[in-house]
Amino acid sequence: MPVRVHNFLGKLGWNARKYLPWLASESYLKLQFVTRRKLQRNYIEYFMSAKEVPQPLVVNLETINRCNSTCEFCTANKYAEKRPYMRMEDELFYQIIDQLSEWGYKGHLTMYGNNEPLLDTRIVEFHKYAREKLPEAFIFMSTNGLLLTVEKVKEIIPYVDQLVINNYCMDMKLHKNIQKIYKYILEHPEEFKDVDVLIQMRYLKEVLTNRAGSAPNKPATDKVIKETCLMPYTDMWIMPNGKLGICCCDNFEVTDLADLHEVSL
């Protein structure tokens, strides 16, 4: 099927996230810890035994650091944003993609971070270039869908393997523009045979993690979580200013690992 609509645990899950947010949040975290432990052990063994440092599983390439949504769990929502405005230079973007191409990169690539990628007017052209240079990479776009139209979807799908539309709402209903897109895809499946379109029903006021103490709707805690986080080893996090960050939860971009103006990937 060219389009799927996913709502975690259906109406039961939605009501839990809406009416029992802290319980839902903590339960989800515990589930993640349980399901990921074996995968983490396997990855650590793989990473430590590799003759060369493995390529990242995911490259997150944020080209603009702004969002147009109001998700209460995120510091990038338009009412909570504190970061200085940044937009990646064209030259730097193309250099990064060229370096990934020289690397023979075949992992996942997304031009998404703590932002809405469609706010960058160059985003379709950027995806086109990435597709040409990285034919074996899995390129996906994650968007809140607020700026999406049928025409915009048709522009982007030739260059992505997956389009993820996060439908953030209060009523468990698709936004009107997303309804039109969903209907169009169902009526024209042949146009979408080479792309996976996933629409995720998301609660706008959901409580997730505390994002290393920065989440607007979940304060920091002194509780020590004795779990391993592998994101600095599995994900490459590139910000619009060319800095390589430690991970997506460093929302205010406090920790820099490198500057891609000075070093290569």
Predicted regions mapped to residue ranges:
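Conserved alpha-helical substructure of the radical SAM core
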Residues: 2-162, 175
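Glycine-centered flexibility motif
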Residues: 107, 115, 210-213, 258
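Short, solvent-exposed loop/turn segments at secondary-structure junctions
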Residues: 66-68, 79-81, 116-117, 145-148, ...
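Conserved AdoMet/S-adenosylmethionine-binding subsite of the radical SAM
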Residues: 120-233, 239
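Accessory C-terminal segments flanking Radical SAM cores
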Residues: 2-10, 55-60, 213-265
